């Protein structure tokens, strides 16, 4: 399937749950459900799609992110703070509010943006 132009987000603000993330065109597995994490296979597919539309680099899907180009997360180490521009897979509608692990509910964003979103 072809990538949609830009792949930016159009979020439902009315709480209807009809988010349309930048990967909504990808076909979900039958195991998709509320409160679930994205699988390793889903993450790999979304990274590939993101890089296809961004000339081989991973870029944030959210225009409000602090960073445009994102870096691969390093292995977590005790006492080492991760880089704020590492990519993370964000549930557009949070899991604790019934958000699913559907492709349509995901955006790739920086660690900083995702962490600050948690604190709102």
Residue ranges of predicted features:
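Active-site or metal-binding loop neighborhoods of secreted/extracellular toxin and effector enzymes
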Residues: 102-120
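Low-complexity, glycine/serine/proline-rich disordered segments
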Residues: 1-51, 70, 80-85, 111, ...
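Short metal-coordination and nucleic-acid-contact micro-motifs, chiefly zinc-binding Cys/His arrays
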Residues: 52-58, 102-106
């Amino acid at each position: 399937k072809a990538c949609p132009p830009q792949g930016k987000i159009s979020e439902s603000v009315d709480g209807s749950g009809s988010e349309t993330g930048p990967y909504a065109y990808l076909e979900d597995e039958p195991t998709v459900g509320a409160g679930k994490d994205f699988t390793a296979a889903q993450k790999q597919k979304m990274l590939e799609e993101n890089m296809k539309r961004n000339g081989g680099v991973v870029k944030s899907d959210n225009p409000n992110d602090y960073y445009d180009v994102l870096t691969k997360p390093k292995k977590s180490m005790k006492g080492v703070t991760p880089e704020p521009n590492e990519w993370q897979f964000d549930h557009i509608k949070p899991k604790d509010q019934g958000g699913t692990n559907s492709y349509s509910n995901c955006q790739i964003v920086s660690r900083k943006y995702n962490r600050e979103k948690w604190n709102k």
